[in-house]
Amino acid sequence: MQTIFVQLKCDLGKAYEVAGELVERDSVSEVYSISGQYDLLAKCYLDNSEDIGRYVESQIHSIAGIRDTHTTIAFNAFT
């Protein structure tokens, strides 16, 4: 399983709509509103065989109201 975090910058007034669309995606486990340069943070779990770039392009960038994204790939989770 691959874990990625996607920070999203939304059009003005669209963050809640974008968040609603994101949580409908099977791979998205959590969506947070955040402060700073980006509006939302999505935590996604992908199969090891899934191409991360294609996933972000087809499943994230396709949502209306997103202006920019920044994707971080997680290596290990420490608990």
Region roles according to the model:
Residues 1-79:
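A compositional/biophysical signature of low hydrophobicity enriched in polar/charged and small residues
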